[in-house]
């Protein structure tokens, strides 16, 4: 269980659906898909990245900020009672009970790469199995796997979520950059060593995703510091 991780959903008065979660910017857990009509607040490139950084760890702020940027009004915000604590969504609240939350969050729709980098996802899907390796940089001469520090770095991502400091978002995003760089390196190794095209394509998708996320969050920290 990822400490402090949760999703918030909002519906605008014109029927649009926007979601946000409490981790990173444009972070979507592996295997989670978003339906085509659902927008992700922190992945919206029409909003300055420094502005999106201010929402980090506070998804209710994210859906409010997204609506404000697009000159839209929220009809309702959906979250649990705990998630509404200390936050007034400024509109109708739909409080989820434990029975309302499905055991599996699997949905049909766009994978995480398609959400944050649709052009890259389309290009990857169009590449034949034989051409996948051409998308990669040359493999290093050292064929040993890189040290796996995933658990340690992910704990650093979670640690700020244990704090009530309202400025915890900066520490959280800084840790997320480190994690993203590590995840990118791990995915690239898997892409170089995969024996099956399906596994290689999945590893390349992860490599591109974490590459985009690392750049996005680094830029968000620079953008927010400049203000």
Describe every region a protein language model picked out.
Residues 1-227:
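Secretion-targeting segments and adjacent low-complexity export tracts
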């Amino acid at each position: 269980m990822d400490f402090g991780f949760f999703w918030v959903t909002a519906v605008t008065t014109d029927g649009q659906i926007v979601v946000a979660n409490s981790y990173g910017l444009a972070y979507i857990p592996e295997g989670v898909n978003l339906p085509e009509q659902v927008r992700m607040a922190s992945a919206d490139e029409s909003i300055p990245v420094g502005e999106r950084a201010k929402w980090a760890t506070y998804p209710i702020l994210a859906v409010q900020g997204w609506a404000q940027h697009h000159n839209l009004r929220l009809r309702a915000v959906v979250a649990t009672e705990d998630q509404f604590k200390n936050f007034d969504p400024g509109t109708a609240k739909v409080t989820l009970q434990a029975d309302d939350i499905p055991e599996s969050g699997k949905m049909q729709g766009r994978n995480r790469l398609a959400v944050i980098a649709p052009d890259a996802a389309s290009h990857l899907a169009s590449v034949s199995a034989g051409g996948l390796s051409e998308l990669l940089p040359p493999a290093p001469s050292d064929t040993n796997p890189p040290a796996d520090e995933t658990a340690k770095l992910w704990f650093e991502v979670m640690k700020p979520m244990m704090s009530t400091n309202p400025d915890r978002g900066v520490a959280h995003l800084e840790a997320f950059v480190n994690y993203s760089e590590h995840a990118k390196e791990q995915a690239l190794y898997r892409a170089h060593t995969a024996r099956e095209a399906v596994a290689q394509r999945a590893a390349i998708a992860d490599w591109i995703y974490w590459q985009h996320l690392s750049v996005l969050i680094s830029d968000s920290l620079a953008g927010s510091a400049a203000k």
